[in-house]
């Protein structure tokens, strides 16, 4: 049976809705679904992920090297864990777009970016030319790295599941980057990638 690993989007405290959309995309692909939570002091996130219906288990990589989810470190972890999976799915958010191309390169596969529909386990639809054309892409890679446009998939429920949580001991520090700071712009409007209506 095919196995898919979904990469959780979170801030070490709360699980982001984009994760539920990514799980929905994984369900469309089919097979068993596990979730990887990489962070520091992120136990609450792992428990929230375990409550998602349809998830078999949650892999929790709780280590200081993942505190700020630096793409260089997280990509090494994902590529390591992904050895046991057929597909790796992540939301096409800022974090996903930063990390997943590195994962695809480490796994030596072509990434399927910004998918908006799943036709079959190896065939996906994605927008090109600023959304004016919808391309149907079939992957011949044995393992697939996929980012999904969150607004194209209705999120799965937050409650109802009872997945087990397993600790992942691997701590990958690439030593290539360091966290300097973060400036968060506060807005009462949703993020563009999560907005149900966009007016331009």
Feature annotation, model-predicted:
Residues 1-200:
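N-terminal glycine-rich FAD/FM-binding segment characteristic of electron-transfer flavoproteins
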């Amino acid at each position: 049976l095919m196995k898919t690993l979904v990469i959780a989007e979170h801030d070490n405290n709360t699980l982001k809705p984009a994760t539920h959309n990514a799980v929905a995309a994984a369900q469309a692909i089919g097979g068993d679904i596990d979730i990887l939570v990489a962070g520091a002091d992120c136990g609450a996130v792992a428990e929230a992920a375990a409550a998602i219906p349809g998830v078999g288990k949650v892999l929790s990589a709780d280590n200081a090297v993942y505190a700020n989810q630096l793409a260089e470190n997280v990509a090494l972890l994902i590529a390591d864990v992904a050895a046991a999976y057929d597909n790796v799915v992540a939301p096409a958010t800022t974090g996903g777009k930063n990390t997943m191309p590195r994962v695809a390169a480490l796994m030596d596969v072509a990434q399927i970016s910004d998918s908006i529909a799943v036709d079959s386990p190896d065939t996906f639809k994605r927008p090109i030319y600023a959304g004016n054309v919808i391309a149907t892409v079939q992957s011949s890679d044995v393992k697939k790295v996929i980012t999904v446009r969150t607004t194209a998939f209705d999120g799965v429920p937050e409650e109802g599941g009872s997945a087990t949580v397993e600790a992942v001991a691997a701590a990958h520090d690439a030593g290539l980057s360091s966290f300097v700071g973060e400036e968060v712009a506060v807005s009462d409007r949703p993020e563009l990638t999560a907005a149900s209506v966009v007016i331009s």
